Swiss-Prot record:
The keyword Magnesium does not apply. Signal peptide: none annotated. This is Ribonuclease PH. It comes from the Bacteria. Phosphorolytic 3'-5' exoribonuclease that plays an important role in tRNA 3'-end maturation. Removes nucleotide residues following the 3'-CCA terminus of tRNAs; can also add nucleotides to the ends of RNA molecules by using nucleoside diphosphates as substrates, but this may not be physiologically important. Probably plays a role in initiation of 16S rRNA degradation (leading to ribosome degradation) during starvation. It comes from Nostoc punctiforme (strain ATCC 29133 / PCC 73102).
């Protein structure tokens, strides 16, 4: 029997996605990203200076941190204080790698952009929502730096969005919620740029294996969702046309 989605969505349908820019006061870029019941607060801060391996090169850097509010899930989780879990470290590296694909670091100069993605509520897809929302926050931060004259030209040279896909009852589904994520026999996180080029694919089978045909189906479904997310991102960035130097 075919999988029936708990929220009534079609197999290739995204959850409702929305961005609330300028959500906090002090960070140059801040966005509350909502994907269904998943909510992630994404902020971008800017500091002079770069890691030692970049000093004197004239190039900037972008790094990311990811955390979950203890009450983001149904059962309260302990705060990660002295040591980060392997999952947290993996996710924040993924966010950083993904967003670095959209930045011209020579245009940024010797400055460091720090992305903070804090999950307020989790219903699966937190890392993909963090990437998609953090890109919007990054664009707003760059816009502010340009307006203030800190930067002479925009270092944004690309656009990045991410989505989850999975196999349920051997069929591909887009943007899994928690119930679906638990039930999926295969689940993927896919990150793409504005040309639908692949930045990263994370995919595993929870039991057994999956075929090359199913892999292609999952990537096709992910591409469809990312096309919609790219449009939603642009609609949340008022000065899109002047801000981006897209190759």
């Amino acid at each position: 029997m075919a999988w029936q989605r708990p929220d009534g969505r079609l197999p290739y349908e995204l959850r409702p996605i929305s961005f609330y820019p300028s959500f906090t006061r002090f960070a140059p870029g801040s966005v509350l990203a909502r994907c269904g019941d998943t909510q992630v607060l994404c902020t971008v801060s800017v500091n002079k200076g770069v890691p030692k391996f970049l000093e004197g090169t004239g190039k900037g850097w972008l790094t990311a941190e990811y955390r979950m509010l203890p009450s983001a899930t149904q059962k309260r989780q302990e705060r990660e204080l002295l040591k980060l879990s392997g999952r947290t470290q993996e996710i924040q590296r993924l966010i950083g790698r993904s967003l670095r694909a959209a930045v011209d670091f020579e245009a940024l100069g010797e400055r460091t952009l720090t992305v903070d993605a804090d999950v307020l509520q989790a219903d699966a897809g937190t890392r993909t929502t963090a990437i998609t929302g953090s890109f919007v926050a990054l664009a707003h931060a760059i816009s502010k730096l340009l307006q203030e004259g800190v930067l002479e030209r925009s270092p944004l040279c690309g656009q990045v969005a991410a989505v989850s896909v999975g196999l349920l009852e051997a069929e591909p589904f887009l943007d899994l919620n928690y119930i679906e994520d638990v039930a999926a026999t295969v689940d993927f996180n896919v990150v793409m740029d504005q040309h639908l080029g692949i930045i990263e694919v994370q995919g595993t089978a929870e039991e057994g294996s999956f075929s090359r045909t199913q892999l292609d189906q999952l990537l096709d479904v992910a591409q469809k969702g990312i096309q919609e997310l790219l449009i939603a991102q642009r609609e949340a960035i008022a000065d899109w046309e002047s801000l981006f130097v897209i190759n």
